[in-house]
A protein has these predicted regions:
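Targeting-peptide/extracellular-domain and disordered-appendage signature
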Residues: 1-184
Length: 184
């Protein structure tokens, strides 16, 4: 979820959730949440955190992928976020209408909901055109026209806006299923 208050404004909330089954650092989960992407601080001024059950994996994802994603470029908070131990994670919903993720870490409880889902579409992006420039990307994407993101019961700012992605009109709020990055 990459959210803005105005389509031509800056991103005000950035969220990326990973459920990883294979990596150089094993399995794990990582929720990168920047509620103040341009702030070069985290707690207590802003909830700029990575909630994870595998620190090595989380740092690998942030350093090699998240920091390369267009919405996260220039997000000073990324370098200053706190890494918080994961205490629980659960998914619910389906891929046709609504999907939810719940993540709990020390002093952080996050609920993410993607609704009004579009038709799934397959993406195959060669390394030369990928965010990292080093990996080919293969994934099934599903756009969401509406999202809800709450932290500790408080709604996060922003809403999804239209974007161009992989040669088609898309949204800044989406699900990426079976996302596979292959180093070339």
């Amino acid at each position: 979820m990459y959210l803005k208050e105005k389509p031509d404004g800056p991103f005000v909330t950035l969220v990326s959730f990973f459920r990883v089954v294979a990596s150089p650092h094993g399995r794990g989960h990582a929720l990168v949440l920047l509620e103040a992407p341009l702030l070069h601080r985290s707690l207590p001024e802003a909830l700029n955190v990575c909630v994870t059950d595998n620190d090595a994996l989380a740092h690998y994802l942030v350093d090699n992928f998240v920091s390369c994603f267009g919405a996260f470029k220039g997000a000073e908070a990324l370098a200053h976020m706190d890494y918080v131990p994961l205490e629980g994670v659960a998914a619910s919903g389906d891929t046709r209408s609504a999907y939810m993720e719940w993540v709990k870490g020390r002093n952080v409880e996050v609920s993410l909901s993607w609704e009004d889902l579009g038709q799934p579409f397959l993406v195959n992006i060669p390394k030369e055109k990928s965010a990292t420039g080093q990996h080919a990307l293969h994934s099934l994407f599903v756009d969401a026209r509406r999202v809800t993101a709450t932290v500790n019961g408080r709604a996060l700012k922003g809403k999804p806006v239209p974007r161009e992605f992989a040669g088609r009109q898309s949204s800044t709020a989406f699900l990426a299923y079976s996302e596979t990055w292959v180093k070339m």
